[in-house]
Amino acid sequence: MANIKSKIKNISRIETARVKNAAIKSRVKKAIRKAREAILENSPKAQELVNKAHHEIGKAVSKGVMHLNKGARKSSRLDLFYNKTKTQ
Protein backbone atom coordinates (compact mmCIF):
# COMPACT_ATOMS: atom_id res chain seq x y z
CA MET A 1 0.00 0.00 0.00
CA ALA A 2 1.24 3.46 -0.85
CA ASN A 3 2.21 5.90 1.90
CA ILE A 4 2.30 9.10 -0.14
CA LYS A 5 -1.00 10.98 -0.26
CA SER A 6 -0.90 11.62 -4.01
CA LYS A 7 -0.18 7.94 -4.71
CA ILE A 8 -3.10 6.86 -2.53
CA LYS A 9 -5.34 9.16 -4.59
CA ASN A 10 -3.77 7.78 -7.77
CA ILE A 11 -4.59 4.21 -6.74
CA SER A 12 -8.20 5.23 -6.15
CA ARG A 13 -8.37 6.96 -9.54
CA ILE A 14 -6.89 3.93 -11.29
CA GLU A 15 -9.40 1.60 -9.62
CA THR A 16 -12.30 3.82 -10.73
CA ALA A 17 -11.01 3.82 -14.31
CA ARG A 18 -10.50 0.04 -14.22
CA VAL A 19 -14.11 -0.54 -13.19
CA LYS A 20 -15.44 1.79 -15.90
CA ASN A 21 -13.23 0.21 -18.56
CA ALA A 22 -14.34 -3.28 -17.53
CA ALA A 23 -17.99 -2.22 -17.85
CA ILE A 24 -17.39 -0.83 -21.34
CA LYS A 25 -15.55 -3.99 -22.44
CA SER A 26 -18.38 -6.10 -21.04
CA ARG A 27 -20.97 -4.08 -22.99
CA VAL A 28 -18.99 -4.61 -26.20
CA LYS A 29 -18.70 -8.36 -25.62
CA LYS A 30 -22.41 -8.69 -24.82
CA ALA A 31 -23.41 -6.71 -27.90
CA ILE A 32 -21.22 -8.86 -30.16
CA ARG A 33 -22.47 -12.08 -28.55
CA LYS A 34 -26.13 -11.07 -28.94
CA ALA A 35 -25.56 -10.07 -32.56
CA ARG A 36 -23.84 -13.37 -33.39
CA GLU A 37 -26.63 -15.37 -31.72
CA ALA A 38 -29.28 -13.45 -33.65
CA ILE A 39 -27.40 -14.03 -36.90
CA LEU A 40 -27.20 -17.78 -36.26
CA GLU A 41 -30.93 -17.92 -35.48
CA ASN A 42 -31.77 -15.92 -38.65
CA SER A 43 -33.59 -13.45 -36.44
CA PRO A 44 -35.19 -10.42 -38.11
CA LYS A 45 -33.50 -8.24 -35.45
CA ALA A 46 -30.02 -9.40 -36.53
CA GLN A 47 -29.20 -6.26 -38.53
CA GLU A 48 -30.36 -4.04 -35.67
CA LEU A 49 -28.17 -5.93 -33.19
CA VAL A 50 -25.18 -5.77 -35.54
CA ASN A 51 -25.63 -2.00 -35.74
CA LYS A 52 -25.83 -1.80 -31.95
CA ALA A 53 -22.60 -3.81 -31.67
CA HIS A 54 -20.89 -1.43 -34.11
CA HIS A 55 -22.09 1.48 -31.98
CA GLU A 56 -20.72 -0.06 -28.76
CA ILE A 57 -17.39 -0.83 -30.44
CA GLY A 58 -17.15 2.75 -31.69
CA LYS A 59 -17.86 4.12 -28.22
CA ALA A 60 -15.16 1.90 -26.69
CA VAL A 61 -12.65 3.09 -29.30
CA SER A 62 -13.54 6.75 -28.79
CA LYS A 63 -13.10 6.44 -25.02
CA GLY A 64 -9.69 4.81 -25.47
CA VAL A 65 -10.70 1.51 -23.89
CA MET A 66 -10.12 -0.34 -27.16
CA HIS A 67 -7.47 0.37 -29.78
CA LEU A 68 -8.70 1.73 -33.11
CA ASN A 69 -7.40 -1.26 -35.07
CA LYS A 70 -8.94 -3.76 -32.66
CA GLY A 71 -12.29 -2.02 -32.96
CA ALA A 72 -12.06 -2.06 -36.75
CA ARG A 73 -11.11 -5.75 -36.69
CA LYS A 74 -14.05 -6.69 -34.46
CA SER A 75 -16.49 -4.69 -36.60
CA SER A 76 -15.11 -6.20 -39.79
CA ARG A 77 -15.29 -9.77 -38.49
CA LEU A 78 -18.85 -9.25 -37.32
CA ASP A 79 -19.82 -7.91 -40.77
CA LEU A 80 -18.08 -10.82 -42.49
CA PHE A 81 -19.95 -13.29 -40.26
CA TYR A 82 -23.26 -11.55 -40.95
CA ASN A 83 -22.74 -11.47 -44.72
CA LYS A 84 -21.47 -15.05 -44.84
CA THR A 85 -24.46 -16.48 -42.97
CA LYS A 86 -26.94 -14.24 -44.79
CA THR A 87 -25.93 -15.63 -48.19
CA GLN A 88 -26.20 -19.26 -47.11
Swiss-Prot record:
Reply yes or no: does the keyword Lipoprotein apply: no
State if Ribonucleoprotein is listed as a keyword: yes
Instruction: List the Gene Ontology MF annotations in alphabetical order.
Output: small ribosomal subunit rRNA binding; structural constituent of ribosome
Q: Name one GO biological process term.
A: translation
List, alphabetically, the Pfam families matched.
Answer: Ribosomal_S20p
The lineage's top-level taxon is: Bacteria
Q: What is this protein called?
A: Small ribosomal subunit protein bS20
